[in-house]
Amino acid sequence: MTTDDESRSVYLGLGTNIGDREANLQEAIERIKGLGLEVVRASSIYETEPVGYHDQPWFLNQVIEANALDWQILSLLKALQNIEREMGRTRTIPNGPRVIDIDILLDDDYVGFFTNTWSAEDNPQIAYASGVILELPHPRLHLRRFVLAPLCEIAPDLMHPQLKKSCSELLAELDDPSIVRIYQSRV
C-alpha cells in the first residue's frame, strides 16, 4: 500500500480458465499497462480449482499491484471491464468459465460502495439489481484462498481496512479447503 502523493495502490485479481490461460493473463497485464497503469508487483501464477460452479476447467489466478493515481475508480472499473469484453469475456453462468476476469480487490484504504451510473449502452453485460457495481474492499476477498494466497505473496502485511487484519493473518485463519498451488513462480 502506498503512502505518498505520487502513487495510489490498487490491487487487482486476475483469473482465467478458457483457452491459453498463461497467455490470457499476460495479455490482460499488457492491456492494463496499456491503460497507463504502472504494474508495481505481480504474484506468481496459481492454479486453482473452481469455486461455486465446479464443472469447468481449473483456473490460473494472479494478483497485481498497480499505481492508479491518475484514475477515478469507476473509470478504472469500466476500462477493466472493457478489457474483459475485448478479450472475449461473456457473463453467462455465475462463477462460470471465463477467458479473463479482472477484479478490483483493494484501492488503498478506501471502504465503500459505488452505484451504477452507466447506461446499458456503456456496458450491456452488467446487470446489478441492487445498483451497486463495486464494493471495496472486494466483499469476498477474505473468503477466497485463490485471492489471498497470491495477494499475501506480494503484500503479506497489507491490512484489510475493515477487518483490521493483515493478508497473512486472513490467510492463516481462512477456512477454505480449495486447492491452490503455484503454477509458475514469479521471476
For the regions a protein language model found, what residue spans apply to each?
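Flexible, gly/pro- and Lys/Arg-enriched active-site loops
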Residues: 51-58, 74-78, 82-187
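Nucleotide and nucleotide-moiety/phosphate-recognizing core
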Residues: 2-12, 18-99, 107-113
